């Protein structure tokens, strides 16, 4: 019989995979027939993580028991102590409905188990009838029973019952996910149906709002909250504390997910042979029991999921159009055959990503890194005087970091040619965590922040004595966004501590936690880069499924040893996992609890882990420290190779670094947020515009950003159009207007009539932000002289033109746009006739070759708003002077 336990439902939502569900529903014999064994893929130490979750549950159960009156909470305990839990586990209660029949039910029931009615939904009933599904029993963590009339929405006929039952699911995670929300909704739906079947419908109703009891770094938070309400004289302090602690799950949202599972997915998967169930290997598969099996199958059949960043929906669209392998995708995109044309007619995203996907596919075939044609990145600088590399590893359950690493490469001012850079590297290990208390993390964060801030302060201090042209730049590199988010979470968690706030002041300005408004100047300076996103943008690598750090580093122009073999970044068994950029967090639990499962791999017994020697605690500590160091080295290698091999594609320009507070920090308090919001909005728009313009022209068109394929309309056809416009709009009589036909595939561009922040350039023009004089290779004074001779620069007020960007010279206004014509066309007028003619004369644009229109960004508002709000007045907040570090 097929088995459907509550873990299968929750994990199906986590992995979103039909094959996973089919394998979980299969019998052992069915799985064995395919050579699938979930136990083969278990990670050593994973039981510690499960035990930590159960321990947190048990602690919260005990909190509820200890703060409630005797007899108000029904529970049972096992007879023996569980060594991993450090206590007797709670035992399931099997007589739930007998308890509910009591004249006065308890306030809470812990781990009450009941059978899910087969008629929960018609689909589930059909699964039982047609496929012999095993009867399912579920066990919500806590049933909280309250007198009716709380105002909570109820499942059922809406009448107020004598009692309401609220489902509570205890989770160690501070931020519950979709799987948690669907799980608690499933419990609520199942219990509501079971209560009706038991004939309790008139007395009990189940709350439609299931709840999550989330994790907290203060293990006594609930007990303290109960005491607070007791001190306030609350009639029911326990219920008040629960109401404040719990996260409510909107039933109407997640009911749809649960019912769709039973009505559609479950039946569809049960009707499918195991080998035919749909699947797609991606980053979310990291902890799936069957991931190795699927990766092997993907390699055997050249599965489309081998392409990093291709999602399952896109892969299914490709397959529906006859493209089933990465090799076929390469052929289809390269030849632009009918299959690919059909795909891009259905998906603008695939149209935009086509060249990158084809490059990734070719790289897999050829086994070498390949650049994506035409792409550039405005997210990473080609050079910085100081480069800081950061890696952070954490436990996603508790949210606590267990390893932080920072390294720097610094070229000081005044160094001589050939002088080596200053290098430094620091590793910080959180070696003790008791009951989710982040105190040790706080101490390591203070050490980490002190080191990185001192590196930044050193450059900033040097720059105060240098002229602008000689000031040193500084930039911070992370591998992926997870590390940045974790850094911000640590700041958020500890910033109220007086010992921490001054130490992290500089870093929070550049990487503010969610509760702080970003500093606009720091934000605009783009202080850091997510290197993985740069690789995604620029390079195809021979790495399947996802660009993990080590796989990327080992395939991206690796260093070569003296014997000619490539150097590999590698870690011992247990310190790295496929498709993950984090040190396995089981190692942290082993270190924190002194219960070590990981063993040294033994070449003499490669398939018998029982003969491998366990790590000692010191060896484990050193192993985590070494793993953190290797992560830093791999990150540095990738950045170095990007700069060596693709320097011309890295277009972010960095100015001299300053750690000084921005002027916005001295603005009156009432105006500060308004000014910051406006400046942040402007900075976001400017960066988005610059990043999009760094894409190849076909991608810009596919994102509806640009109008491409512009060619001058024959004069005989253009003249009547121009005459009609000038007749209807006399203000254009003295102007020179141009009429261009453009590509029909650009009809849906967001550029509209009346837009005047638009530049026209040849399709091979790469950088509209480059000053025209630098492009022509002339200095400021020579450029000024040339403009003076042309009558373009007549006074000091015109000197801005000397340093104008190419985009400014090529700025035009859209006078008319006829996108729906059989041959679409656009009519434009120069923004500045003199500058435009100057650009034509100096071959900055050739109207005889194919052209493209790109939106520009100019900030017209932030300066005015800043001035107006400063004029309103008010006292600025006092500036705290950071004390000197020793």
For the regions a protein language model found, what residue spans apply to each?
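Acidic, Mg2+-coordinating catalytic module of metal-dependent nucleases/exonucleases
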Residues: 227-230, 235-301, 312, 540, ...
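Accessory interdomain/linker segments of ATP-dependent helicases and helicase-like nucleic-acid enzymes
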Residues: 12, 28, 33-74, 638-779
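A non-catalytic, helix-rich entry segment at domain boundaries
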Residues: 33-106, 331-376, 674-703
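C-terminal extensions
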Residues: 278-280, 294-449, 665, 672, ...
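Long, compositionally biased intrinsically disordered regions
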Residues: 335, 339, 344-357, 583-708, ...
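Conserved DEDDh/DEDDy metal-dependent 3′-5′ exonuclease domain
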Residues: 120-129, 139-146, 161-265, 425-586
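Pre-ATPase regulatory/linker segments immediately N-terminal to the P-loop/RecA-like helicase/translocase core
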Residues: 208-259, 563, 576-606, 753, ...
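Metal-dependent nuclease catalytic cores that hydrolyze phosphodiester bonds in DNA/RNA
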Residues: 1-157
